[in-house]
Amino acid sequence: MARVEIEIPDDVTAEVDHLDLTVEGPEGSVTRRLWYPDVDVSVEDDAVVVASEVDDAKTDSTVGTFESHVANMFHGVSEGWEYKLEVHYSHFPMQVDVEGEEVVIQNFLGEKAARRTQIRGDTDVVVDDEEVTLSGPSIEDVGQTAADIEQLTRVTDKDTRVFQDGVYIVEKPAKGGA
């Protein structure tokens, strides 16, 4: 019999459409499907209510998980999420660019072919010399884009003690930061 109310911030609106919760604010909007058997998500007055009539551990933990998702959505649309990555190279000067909806890394370890990865969702990517900044309203989209960029420059066939070239996440939001 878990019931949690998450207060909606002043500059944010929330709306439930069947199983999808849509949250809009000054930084953008985020939609997420929140479904689990016997767990109901609704908007009442100035709060999002996550409730369940079933009293078991799995359902109670799911209510807590949904509470965290909603809090992350509120934080994302009001303040946004930000990751910082740094470009490191010692052998070949690599170049990181944004082309449309892709991040392109050229001359990684002297490779002639460019490495590419998609930018997810509403994530903004800003490349400033040796620093890459990712920001957006969805923590999942921003975090996954950062991880994709980091994995794109992973060195697998050389000694990583010598070849430390790559793009690495150096700053990300703290857990429980919402």
UniProtKB/Swiss-Prot annotation:
Gene3D superfamilies membership: Ribosomal protein L6, alpha-beta domain (3.90.930.12)
A GO cellular component annotation in the UniProt record: cytosolic large ribosomal subunit
Keyword ATP-binding: no
Example GO BP: cytoplasmic translation
One Pfam family named in its UniProt record: Ribosomal_L6
UniProt xrefs under InterPro entries: Ribosomal_uL6-like, Ribosomal_uL6-like_a/b-dom_sf, Ribosomal_uL6_a/b-dom, Ribosomal_uL6_arc, Ribosomal_uL6_CS2
Keywords associated with the record: Ribonucleoprotein, Ribosomal protein, RNA-binding, rRNA-binding
Superkingdom field: Archaea
GO MF annotations, alphabetized: rRNA binding; structural constituent of ribosome
The UniProt record lists the keyword Ribosomal protein: yes
Subunit structure: Part of the 50S ribosomal subunit.
Sequence similarity: Belongs to the universal ribosomal protein uL6 family.
PANTHER family in the cross-refs: 60S RIBOSOMAL PROTEIN L9 (PTHR11655:SF16), 60S/50S RIBOSOMAL PROTEIN L6/L9 (PTHR11655)
Protein's job: This protein binds to the 23S rRNA, and is important in its secondary structure. It is located near the subunit interface in the base of the L7/L12 stalk, and near the tRNA binding site of the peptidyltransferase center.
Name the UniProt record assigns to this protein: Large ribosomal subunit protein uL6
Name of the gene: rpl6
